[in-house]
Regions:
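Mixed-charge (Asp/Glu-Lys/Arg
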Residues: 1-160
Length: 160
């Protein structure tokens, strides 16, 4: 896990519980490929993880950590002693199994579970999240900022 200081990501102070912004000025396409090894201006999975962490900071959580992308046990964001979270920047909706995985980790650590998804959730996943006590959020990128929204009441009530 790594702290977020110095990563060039800022939180929208007008509405930290709604939108998390990453400064984004699209460079030329050739430069993107040389710098990041990809053609697209679409943020990568790491950008989504950082945006989710910034959102949690905007809610008032302190010492939010972002996983290093290695064997993190499915934990992409963490607030030690408070919560664990997973972030999926996939095109497909998230089903129940990934929610069960993060809920299991949260239960073992005695903390809350949250999940951030770019594509949303299946109906079964949303229904299961209530019983599994997982706060659900969608996370999207539009032009130059990330938008994070609570999907269920557990997500909407998340407090430090």
């Amino acid at each position: 896990m790594h702290g977020l200081d110095g990563l060039g990501v800022s939180t929208n102070s007008r509405s930290p519980s709604r939108t998390t912004e990453i400064a984004h000025k699209p460079p030329r396409r050739g430069l993107i490929r040389r710098l990041f090894g990809r053609k697209s201006l679409e943020p990568g999975w790491r950008d989504y993880e950082i945006a989710a962490a910034r959102y949690l900071e905007g809610l008032g959580f302190r010492s939010v950590e972002v996983g290093d992308g290695g064997s993190d046990g499915g934990v992409d964001v963490r607030v030690r002693g408070r919560l664990v979270g997973q972030v999926k920047a996939h095109q497909a909706k998230v089903g129940r199994p990934p929610l069960q995985q993060i809920a299991g980790v949260a239960s073992a650590e005695g903390v809350n579970a949250v999940f951030f998804s770019k594509a949303g959730y299946t109906k079964t996943a949303v229904e299961w999240a209530v019983a599994g006590e997982v706060g659900l959020f969608t996370i999207s990128f539009d032009d130059d900022h990330f938008d994070v929204r609570a999907v269920n009441s557990l997500g909407g009530r998340l407090k430090p």
